């Protein structure tokens, strides 16, 4: 009996010491779950409006490269307008005119991207139109050829850490509140203030993001000039899930005489804007059915005889963009803008708007129907000019406004666009 008691005591002591030892040992680390395939945050393109990015983009595994995503936009548009710029002509496309009516494709584009890992890339190519208010609009094939070529966006990116990255190539600008292509925006037409902003840049860009802050700086060629002389930057702060405030801008640190280049070069690179500086401040509210974005813009170009600019000029402008979604399939978007140029009407040769002392107001409304990846939208836009310089056909001079003689001060545009994004 005593022997059995001794053995039982030893067994109990052994079990107790084993339990204590087990308690002191760290629990084995759980095996990490493999990353879910094809669920990365995409690099682009940005969708800023009621036409939304595909929540399930096409994706395929590419071996050591990782997951590759592809998408695109196939859309067409048409419009009728009053008082076209009938006197518009460019040697770069001698058969192109600003017509009173046009039907064309607005996007025949596709993109491919690798948005994960240290080495990433984004490439977007195809045909496009970038219609804008208050400016001449030519055919989509001509725009694709003369603006940013059939390869408007193509850049590589190195993601050093979760916060830091460096990218280079052809990239969307850091400036402004509207994106280049129609499907990316609340409205079909780009606004008046958009005309002062460079759209696609070639250069190098450094990015930092941490918590609510995101900061980017870039050295670029500005208005697709080919020479890296522009410095641009953007700072955004996300106040909460619904509110974001930001500032962005840039300036040309050099001087370019665009007039000394070909007509083809001048089409994408306007001399006054290329040699200017610009500053924007914007705020965005996005919550439930509402999207609201007001922003203010200031631009300035100094006199520079080397660049063919003999008078300085500035513009001041503000815009309010908004959209309300009544249902998952129907929304209403709108935009109002006002912009003016400094100076006295008829003085100087520097025209950032419609000549010195001119001003412009625009109103746009865009009902939009969406179903899955398909959309259909119509648009009405009105532009009203003030302070234009008037001409006389009898004297062989043209005004700086709309119409055959440049003396018209208003333009109405009725537009429709439809297609799919995928």
Kindly give the residue locations of the regions a language model identified.
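Surface-exposed coil loops of outer-membrane beta-barrel proteins
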Residues: 79-81, 85-100, 131-153, 161-240, ...
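Glycine- and aromatic-enriched membrane insertion/assembly motifs of diderm outer-membrane
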Residues: 96-130, 325, 330
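Outer-membrane beta-barrel channels and translocator barrels
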Residues: 65, 115-119, 161-163, 173, ...
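Residues that define the transmembrane beta-barrel architecture of outer-membrane proteins
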Residues: 66, 101-106, 147-152, 198-202, ...
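Transmembrane beta-barrel strands of outer-membrane/channel proteins
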Residues: 42, 72-80, 123-127, 168-170, ...
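N-terminal periplasmic/intermembrane-space "pro-region" immediately following the signal or transit peptide
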Residues: 1-88, 417, 422
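Outer-membrane beta-barrel pore domains
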Residues: 94-97, 134, 141-145, 245-249, ...
